[in-house]
């Protein structure tokens, strides 16, 4: 029996998706065959998903804006009263243009888009960006969710470089949610985290990310952190909004107006 490695392969869930699997493999620069792979990018009826391989692996990770958690939060999440809405400055007559520079699976960006914000997303990890692109494409076909994801524009690449080289109108608000180095096993409970860490790693460049965001944003920068985590090295936030498990550090530059 071959030992499991750290590689990633692409596979079709059924024969009818073989052509799409080949296209994704070519685009991502990944093999279709690797018996020692630790992860599989799977293409099937539910779109694109990443499956960690091995006996203790959690279920697949995919982006779904139409059903499940995203739909529940859209319908019952608390609307403009949500802490994230307050953090980015949503108020009566105010829907800021927001750059989510650490998009991940797009969950927070989708919440803000569902509340009416025009969103630009940056994701640096090509596999995560592929999941996000696939999820956005599927959501566009949905009558109810299509208009929401129509407010979400995805960019790929290094967010620090993207922000430093930004052209055109600056985003009013930049939202950062850096991957925080884990201290205990409880941080690995969520399957997304178990899959993400080996692929993405921690955001050790968070201070540079904050610096670039503060230089670009016209009105404010918001940083999401674990509740007890230290602030990112650099300027101090003016204030924070604290929840049960998360905290939003707010760095204002100029007041948002209706």
UniProtKB/Swiss-Prot annotation:
Pfam families: SAM_MT (PF04445). S-adenosyl-L-methionine binds at residues 123-124, 177. It comes from the Bacteria. CDD domains: AdoMet_MTases. It is an enzyme of class 2 (transferase). Keywords: Cytoplasm, Methyltransferase, rRNA processing, S-adenosyl-L-methionine, Transferase. One of its GO terms (molecular function) is rRNA (guanine-N2-)-methyltransferase activity. GO terms for cellular component: cytoplasm. HAMAP family: 16SrRNA_methyltr_J (MF_01523). Belongs to the methyltransferase superfamily. RsmJ family. This is Ribosomal RNA small subunit methyltransferase J. It comes from Pseudomonas putida (strain ATCC 47054 / DSM 6125 / CFBP 8728 / NCIMB 11950 / KT2440).
